[in-house]
Amino acid sequence: MSKVDLWQDATAQAELVRSGEISRTELLEATIAHVQAVNPEINAVIIPLFEKARRESELASGPFAGVPYLLKDLTVVSQGDINTSSIKGMKESGYRADHDAYFVQRMRAAGFVLLGKTNTPEMGNQVTTEPEAWGATRNPWNLGRSVGGSSGGSGAAVAAALSPVAHGNDAAGSVRIPASVCGVVGLKPTRGRISPGPLVTDSDNVAGAAHEGLFARSVRDIAALLDVVSGHRPGDTFCAPTASRPYAQGISENPGSLRVGVLTHNPVGDFALDPECAAAARGAAAALAALGHDVNDAYPEALGDRSFLKDYSTICDVAIAREIERNGELIGRPLTEDDVEWTSWEMVKRADQVTGRAFAACVDELRYYAGKVERWWEAGWDLLILPTVTRQTPEIGELMLAKGTDLEGRQSAFISGSLQMLAFTVPFNVSGQPAISLPIGMSSDGMPIGVQIVAAYGREDLLLQVAAQLEGALPWVARRPQLLNPSRKIPAA
């Protein structure tokens, strides 16, 4: 029996199990051993579910039978398992979810085995994953660097081969930012593509800006995962256009010559775009031009206006306040200032000043901004290429605000100190368009740099076809973080 490298993607792992080259038990036990060896260094998996995984692995059936995955510890829950949203009070309560989210149900139906839950900043309200409840997640490429956020645990886990794929959610870049700084592929699909239900929270609370997303190390895994988890369910607020065929079937096809716009500067001008981030985007653009696409410097004019962030920040304040209230309902007592981080409580105080009419006005402004962004695609452009983040990967602690920091005049605790991380991602949460971060660049100090590609609403098919083209032209699969030991193999039986 041959050995298997845990760096192989989910598609390859599934084929090895299916062909009998390795058993699902061998795959799972090797993955668990790898998590136990590596996770103490990076703190990506905060709630291991190894015994549950062993039970479910024996019963798994479907195209990915026996392949492990990880779930972000935020809003999308698994029955019987601890759920904290990285809230101190929730962790102390020992609360366990009483149902499986639709995402979890669909992953199980495809044969995936839930291995554990990953770290997130408290309620996902930061762009670095350093919650008080669980501690910081560290970047496998450099343990002193951030993994981004808010799906930082999932991004780091996939980068370190703790699982081939993982779940995340994205309200301002929370999948794409960790994908960029951890060197993996991260997809935020079209609004309504993946159901957040049956307990719908972020989908409504962030006015449709929060979307369930996916992490993998290959584009083909992202396509296959999207086929597994896509689809409207009862109670969903939004519904994406139905795909004409499975995404996994279409990614190898040539999409023809497309009109591609490129943005490699900050159109607002309030800070300078990091030169290495810009260079990575230009490299991707050059590769697409060489493949026959019509590539030009062009972008939606709306990206030069960030005034919408004031309204978005108000909506985020209200969303956090409601999440604190809802989590208190789950444990049978109100969560207080002592149960949450100080920045979250500041957001609650701000939310208490928001009237119903003011909130409705903020939603209206976001809808107006979304239309301005989307009209660029309506004018005949197919794709936009731009850096995922606009700065180098921050150090651990760099983006955390010291308690008592004066927030007066800042847009919110959610935005403060983090604009350069999310400036190029949050517009597409508001517009609801699909966007993917690809690990195309490397910085001079050895850190990954992601390049973002954005398609028109509902056009994940086109997005994934072009992502696959770039994966072929600028292969990244051989890159592995220093932490990952390539010799860690599944032992022969």
UniProtKB/Swiss-Prot annotation:
Catalysis performed (reactions): 1,8-diazacyclotetradecane-2,9-dione + H2O = N-(6-aminohexanoyl)-6-aminohexanoate
Entry EC no(s): 3.5.2.12
Catalytic residues of the enzyme: K72 (charge relay system), S150 (charge relay system), S174 (acyl-ester intermediate)
Keywords, in A-Z order: Hydrolase, Nylon degradation, Plasmid
GO molecular function, a single term: 6-aminohexanoate-cyclic-dimer hydrolase activity
Thermal profile of function: Optimum temperature is 33 degrees Celsius. Loses 50% and 100% of activity after 10 minutes of heating at 45 degrees Celsius and 50 degrees Celsius, respectively.
pH dependence: Optimum pH is 7.3. Is stable from pH 5.5 to 8.5.
GO biological process: nylon catabolic process
Domain of life: Bacteria
Pfam families for this protein: Amidase (PF01425)
Principal EC category: hydrolase
Known regulation of activity: Strongly inhibited by 1 uM diisopropylphosphofluoridate and 10 uM p-chloromercuribenzoate but scarcely inhibited by 100 mM EDTA in vitro.
Pathway the protein acts in: Xenobiotic degradation; nylon-6 oligomer degradation
Family designation: Belongs to the amidase family.
Description of how the protein assembles with itself and partners: Homodimer.
Database matches in PANTHER family: GLUTAMYL-TRNA(GLN) AMIDOTRANSFERASE SUBUNIT A, MITOCHONDRIAL, TRANSAMIDASE
Summary of the function given for this chain in its UniProt record: Specifically catalyzes the hydrolysis of 6-aminohexanoic acid cyclic dimer (1,8-diazacyclotetradecane-2,9-dione) to form the linear dimer 6-aminohexanoyl-6-aminohexanoic acid. Is inactive on 6-aminohexanoic acid oligomers (degree of polymerization 2 to 6), various other cyclic amides, cyclic diamides, linear amides, oligopeptides, and casein. Allows the bacterium to grow on a medium containing 6-aminohexanoic acid cyclic dimer as the sole carbon and nitrogen sources.
Name the UniProt record assigns to this protein: 6-aminohexanoate-cyclic-dimer hydrolase
Organism of origin: Paenarthrobacter ureafaciens
Phylogenetic classification of the source organism: Bacteria, Bacillati, Actinomycetota, Actinomycetes, Micrococcales
